[in-house]
Amino acid sequence: LSCGDVATQMASCINYLRGAGPLPAACCNGVKNLKNSATTTQDRRTACKCLISASKTISGVNFGLAAGLPAKCGVSIPYKISPSTNCDQVN
């Protein structure tokens, strides 16, 4: 799993995460694909680090929307998408 993979899966979520549009089905599909491809602890930590890094570099991200995204898509992930998340603690 690479940050490129994460970015590809999450690209359709950007407008929603900026509060600039509705939640597209493609975004939830990306969230589900990402969860399904992160099968090991290392993959989950990589995905976490990539998500946190991307959320800091994309301007205008609403972290409330980001944190709620997995639940809105019906997916459970073992960490919060937040700048303060310590990805090294993800199992």
Swiss-Prot record:
Disulfide bonds: 3-50, 13-27, 28-73, 48-87
Job description of the protein: Plant non-specific lipid-transfer proteins transfer phospholipids as well as galactolipids across membranes. May play a role in wax or cutin deposition in the cell walls of expanding epidermal cells and certain secretory tissues.
Species of provenance: Vitis sp. (Grape)
Protein origin, superkingdom: Eukaryota
InterPro entries in the record: Bifun_inhib/LTP/seed_sf (IPR036312), Bifunc_inhib/LTP/seed_store (IPR016140), Plant_nsLTP (IPR000528)
One of the GO BP terms on file: lipid transport
UniProt-recorded Gene Ontology molecular function terms: lipid binding
Pfam families registered for this protein in UniProt: Tryp_alpha_amyl
Gene3D superfamilies, alphabetized: Plant lipid-transfer and hydrophobic proteins
SUPFAM superfamilies hit by this protein: Bifunctional inhibitor/lipid-transfer protein/seed storage 2S albumin
This protein's name: Non-specific lipid-transfer protein P3
Gene Ontology annotations for the cellular component aspect, listed alphabetically: extracellular region
Main location: secreted
Keyword terms: Disulfide bond, Lipid-binding, Secreted, Transport
PANTHER family associated with the record: NON-SPECIFIC LIPID-TRANSFER PROTEIN 2-RELATED (PTHR33076)
Location in or out of the cell: Secreted
Annotated family: Belongs to the plant LTP family.
